Amino acid sequence: MWYDGIDRNTFIKQIYTKVPELLNVRIDAISLKRDGTEVSVVFDMPVYPDNPPEKWNGNNTVSIEISFFVISEFKLEMKDRYMYGNIDIFSHESKIKIVVDGSILCSFVAEAAVIQRMSAYIYIT
């Protein structure tokens, strides 16, 4: 699964009976640190969890931030004003390859990744 090579993935496995693939997700931010060694991706999970913590009651959307470290081969192309697309995260030559394909095209390779935060909120369409 996409989260297997990411540190601090225990919580996501606890709140989902089956963690969904990252298909057609709303992407809030893709940020590259000034020195180019870290990329953070913030996006909404495509499905609300079936076992959310009690403090999330009343919410309908989960936001997740993943930070990737020691970045190479970074590419980014905007096709639309709003960012959404499929996010594919997989093992690649003992590193982590990230590919975003949708209204934004982004790809890069990282040596490590960690889930920095997960939070819930009410998304209004």
Where does each model-flagged region fall?
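Surface-exposed, interaction-prone regions used to assemble/regulate multi-protein complexes
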Residues: 1-125
